Amino acid sequence: MNFTTKRINSANAVINGSIALSKIEEKFEKVIKKIAKNIKIDGFRKGKVPTQVIKTRYKEQIDQDAQQEAIQELLTAALKELEIQPNSLIGNPMISQFNKLNDKIELEIKLGITPTLNLDNVEDYTPEVKLKTISKNLIDERLEEIAKNRAPLNEITQERTLQKDDTAQIDFEGFVDGKAFEGGKGENFNLAIGSNQFIPGFEDALIGMKNGEKRTIKVTFPEQYQAKHLAGKEASFDVTLHKILQKELPKIDDEFAKSIAGEESNLQSLKDMIKEQLEMEQKTEIYNKELKEKLVEILLKNISFDLPDLIVEQEMDILFRNALSQLKPEEFDKIKNNQDEAKKQRETHKDEARKSVQITFIMDALAKKYNIAINDNEVLQTIYYEAMMMGQDPKATLEHYQKNNLVPAIKMTMLEDRVLHYLLDKKFEESKANTNAQKDNQ
């Protein structure tokens, strides 16, 4: 058994070696004993099958297992020479070249090594965050919104017409081209006028109706309406108004606060809670609209390290397969039947693959640095929640993700969000502390 090793960089190494066939044959007896322990052949007791029978029936497996053991010995010796611990390898070593000659096998093995990242100054890379002060008016507006949402609906007893901000209890049936359509009918439906719950123009057309009045209104479905067969079409609705309802707003005081946040609460503590919620909403908006993508690019620029080529190649394969799945059949066949074109198209994903692998290593290292983790239950909850929000069956969605090995990707996305939120939260707190300090000095 002979080999040479080459450390290409901190994340990649190559082993070139040869193993004599006689060395592999020395493994036969050991391999045969392993096989004998586990096989069962009619006419023989388990573990008592004659060696010659095993050699005849399992010749191919014996050759493969013995060869694998010899390669493993070569790999172990080469790792020792390279001073690489087996647990620092990432992915499986790849046999990139393999030639079987009359007296030996020659092979090349490529190794991917988990890179080491320097995260000493990572918090300095987080962009500055400027938070708007949560004003008293904003808090009061949210309080009024909460009160409005919790207010009971009471029927208007005096005779008057339907107005904006009222709630109309109606029967309705819609028609397109003179025919009723699915989902276009409702009875005793409570519709808040001004909520824009129905298609544009519908709610405004009800204003001025009286109890018991019937009215036919004409509207046009938006061009981008979710039901494609209705998009852009004119429709008429027969509407009957049964009741005019109005919300009775509660008094916003300590009792109201208790009904919202519990007996230990008062109006001031509720306002404090609302302020925290508004700050969280502001941070989330800034994170999603401005900082997430910006912070990722900053981390990619400032935390540089060698990438394991094997992992980059795997990511290129994933991106290439995803791109192929989006092609029209004729475009797919064109690439499928042209190896040169396939290689060319696959290569276009290299930069994206490198960036994806780099940010994955960065996020994993940051998660370890800050003791951030995502457990399996959180992943399941996320999958179930998103499925329900999309109107899909959660169990079927989970099975789809598991079958297509998509769960790890979801977990990685969740981890990335949590790590970035952690870094930005630290910056938010710094910004908040600086703002408070400036106020104290004024």
Swiss-Prot record:
<dbReference type="GO" id="GO:0015031">
    <property type="term" value="P:protein transport"/>
</dbReference>
<keyword id="KW-0131">Cell cycle</keyword>
<keyword id="KW-0963">Cytoplasm</keyword>
<dbReference type="Pfam" id="PF05697">
    <property type="entry name" value="Trigger_N"/>
</dbReference>
<dbReference type="GO" id="GO:0003755">
    <property type="term" value="F:peptidyl-prolyl cis-trans isomerase activity"/>
</dbReference>
<protein>
    <recommendedName>
        <fullName>Trigger factor</fullName>
        <ecNumber>5.2.1.8</ecNumber>
    </recommendedName>
</protein>
<dbReference type="InterPro" id="IPR005215">
    <property type="entry name" value="Trig_fac"/>
</dbReference>
<dbReference type="InterPro" id="IPR037041">
    <property type="entry name" value="Trigger_fac_C_sf"/>
</dbReference>
<dbReference type="GO" id="GO:0005737">
    <property type="term" value="C:cytoplasm"/>
</dbReference>
<dbReference type="InterPro" id="IPR036611">
    <property type="entry name" value="Trigger_fac_ribosome-bd_sf"/>
</dbReference>
<dbReference type="InterPro" id="IPR046357">
    <property type="entry name" value="PPIase_dom_sf"/>
</dbReference>
<dbReference type="InterPro" id="IPR008881">
    <property type="entry name" value="Trigger_fac_ribosome-bd_bac"/>
</dbReference>
<dbReference type="InterPro" id="IPR001179">
    <property type="entry name" value="PPIase_FKBP_dom"/>
</dbReference>
<keyword id="KW-0143">Chaperone</keyword>
<comment type="similarity">
    <text>Belongs to the FKBP-type PPIase family. Tig subfamily.</text>
</comment>
<keyword id="KW-0413">Isomerase</keyword>
<dbReference type="GO" id="GO:0051301">
    <property type="term" value="P:cell division"/>
</dbReference>
<dbReference type="GO" id="GO:0006457">
    <property type="term" value="P:protein folding"/>
</dbReference>
<dbReference type="InterPro" id="IPR027304">
    <property type="entry name" value="Trigger_fact/SurA_dom_sf"/>
</dbReference>
<comment type="function">
    <text>Involved in protein export. Acts as a chaperone by maintaining the newly synthesized protein in an open conformation. Functions as a peptidyl-prolyl cis-trans isomerase.</text>
</comment>
<dbReference type="Pfam" id="PF00254">
    <property type="entry name" value="FKBP_C"/>
</dbReference>
<keyword id="KW-0697">Rotamase</keyword>
<keyword id="KW-0132">Cell division</keyword>
<dbReference type="InterPro" id="IPR008880">
    <property type="entry name" value="Trigger_fac_C"/>
</dbReference>
<feature type="domain" description="PPIase FKBP-type">
    <location>
        <begin position="165"/>
        <end position="250"/>
    </location>
</feature>
<dbReference type="Pfam" id="PF05698">
    <property type="entry name" value="Trigger_C"/>
</dbReference>
